[in-house]
Amino acid sequence: MIGCGACEPKVKMAGGQAAAALPTWKMAARRSLSARGRGILQAAAGRLLPLLLLSCCCGAGGCAAVGENEETVIIGLRLEDTNDVSFMEGGALRVSERTRVKLRVYGQNINNETWSRIAFTEHERRRHSPGERGLGGPAPPEPDSGPQRCGIRTSDIIILPHIILNRRTSGIIEIEIKPLRKMEKSKSYYLCTSLSTPALGAGGSGSTGGAVGGKGGSGVAGLPPPPWAETTWIYHDGEDTKMIVGEEKKFLLPFWLQVIFISLLLCLSGMFSGLNLGLMALDPMELRIVQNCGTEKEKNYAKRIEPVRRQGNYLLCSLLLGNVLVNTTLTILLDDIAGSGLVAVVVSTIGIVIFGEIVPQAICSRHGLAVGANTIFLTKFFMMMTFPASYPVSKLLDCVLGQEIGTVYNREKLLEMLRVTDPYNDLVKEELNIIQGALELRTKTVEDVMTPLRDCFMITGEAILDFNTMSEIMESGYTRIPVFEGERSNIVDLLFVKDLAFVDPDDCTPLKTITKFYNHPLHFVFNDTKLDAMLEEFKKGKSHLAIVQRVNNEGEGDPFYEVLGIVTLEDVIEEIIKSEILDETDLYTDNRTKKKVAHRERKQDFSAFKQTDSEMKVKISPQLLLAMHRFLATEVEAFSPSQMSEKILLRLLKHPNVIQELKYDEKNKKAPEYYLYQRNKPVDYFVLILQGKVEVEAGKEGMKFEASAFSYYGVMALTASPVPLSLSRTFVVSRTELLAAGSPGENKSPPRPCGLNHSDSLSRSDRIDAVTPTLGSSNNQLNSSLLQVYIPDYSVRALSDLQFVKISRQQYQNALMASRMDKTPQSSDSENTKIELTLTELHDGLPDETANLLNEQNCVTHSKANHSLHNEGAI
């Protein structure tokens, strides 16, 4: 038996070598491992020393083997390369299935066979808790105090049979990891190492056993060999030798194909989003409008889109379903590539917002018609693809929400749309006004556009169609004139200007004759009648003028119809075109604002159609003239045949300025021109009322009474003259002419031819007319009246339109003189007498009728004288 002393030197040597070698690999380990690795290294060194001491008990051959083949000690592992599938996590190695991983092995005496001393097991190392110790007795031997055998080595991790050495302290091995079992997401494996050499032979074992048995009393034949007599796998200390195999990260598709799909899905997402905005914004009404009035390209686009857009809910469901499907798929593919949910969400959100929402919607909102028409085939394709899901939902929406009609604008919205889009459309202001006026026609009433009754031009039914009346009608410029009786609100007839085409102003035709002959119907409307209804009435041709009335039920009494004004077709048209229609005769631009028309260069002047001064200005009927003549001759002493011949009276009444008319205005009743006489104001004329009414105020008490036709005033004014003495009529007879008159036989000059014309009687230079010497007494009588002035003590004011006779004192005195000249007998000596009458220039001029009257009288006188001389010569 080999004693232990024989082995002692070798044990010492082995211990010394181990002790000497331990610092070497410890320093190497410290340089490459962490603090935890250094702890594992010290524990491994503590285990090696007992093994080395036990090996000294072996035989000489055993000791020699130990000295020649030193034990390989594995300290730890780490990943050579890290990536997405192989990395360190929490001190453990994390790798993926179906991969090959390179590991760097740290330890002592790393050689080409080291790969065979490494294995992995699925079973975790068992650790005893302190409670497992016996109570009151010695502690049982702890397995953790020495090497602990590892469980069954796994076949899921294969150590490839090669190693790359590096200075015998580290090496690189490669392992292959097989797939995990079904339903396993991850699995943990633990590192196991082999510490003992291969088992010895029988003799060796017996010797060793005998030595040990002899030493310790247990090395007898038949006992099982010690654990280190064969290859023993033990757990490696330290958590850093734990390996976690995770599920292999599988891509749904190859990376390049996924990139293509992601790009395509982004395009589809943008298309669905853009079409959803572009097509759904084109409502069916707008598409119909574009089909009818758009350009050729727009008509083509609308024609292609309209059948699809007509199925609004079906199209909406298809586009939304496709958009959601595309966006969801895009997120899944991005998550598969990124490997992180947060990254996938951020990237997909950015991509969808920019390329799937903002850009396509910005384009389709402006060019939706073109984009929708060019992608109509894709739209139809996806509508067919999503038909099973989208069509039932669309039908449900049709039942719940009803059929889509489209955008419909009412009158107010359409007007506002025109106003808002005015800067962007090509409508001119006049066109826009006409459109607005036509749309507002139903919202306005005739009361808004009518001409109030107080501003209407109207004619009384008692009017006479003389020159003044017809001139007033023509100057008004209206073609349809209401005719009233009594009050202006009592409109009884309607006069058309064309009805006066065959009326002669000289005939003084009564207005009633014309209105009764034509009998134009009156059209009454209520004040709340809309303008569109009024336009329809005017279009029927019944009338282009209507009388606006309302039911007045204010106050006590029964309701009655109150006339408010007049509305015409022109008023309605002006509201439609939002502008005033002006013609040549308009005086105002607006019948409501009363803004006058600007001054026109050409004005209508009807003076060319007036009668001359020699004509009667006011036409009266022959019957009225006869009645007036007989009344003055029989009822008024100043015009009796004893004072004035009937012939001269008739000529006086036919004088143009004798018969006059006065138009009465109800608005200005107290105007001075309506007073024929005023109290305490001198007058020199006589007045006879023919037609109309006057009011007479007489006496200090101011008694008033009304008078009508054939009442006369101012008889005393005919015998009293307010004319100054310088302007009075004077009779001058030259001395030579008086002497010639005294001796008629001496006058041998031929008689002056008769023929005092109009120019001679009114000439400023020739103021003397011939008179006979026998008028001396009359001359004295006339001169005696020059100092008399007539001042009435009463007032006469018109109450209506008047037609009256106005004879001034000058006209009366001329008529008296003409009458006396007509009555005075002519002598034979008057043929050589020249009598000239000086007349002042009257304020209204000497009438031609008086001059003709004097000419006729002189002609008669001279003809008688010539006739007597002719008879004497014959004798």
Swiss-Prot record:
Outcome when changing residue 357 to K? In HOMGSMR1; results in decreased cellular uptake of magnesium
Please list the tissues where expression of this protein has been recorded: Widely expressed. Expressed at higher level in brain, kidney and placenta, while it is weakly expressed in skeletal muscle. In the kidney, it is expressed in the distal convoluted tubule and the thick ascending limb of Henle loop.
Q: Where is the CNNM transmembrane domain?
A: 251-431
Write down a Pfam family by its short name.
Ig_CNNM4_N
* GO BP term (any one): magnesium ion homeostasis
Extracellular compartment ranges equal 1-250, 360-368
What is the name attached to this protein's record?
Answer: Metal transporter CNNM2
The gene it comes from is: CNNM2
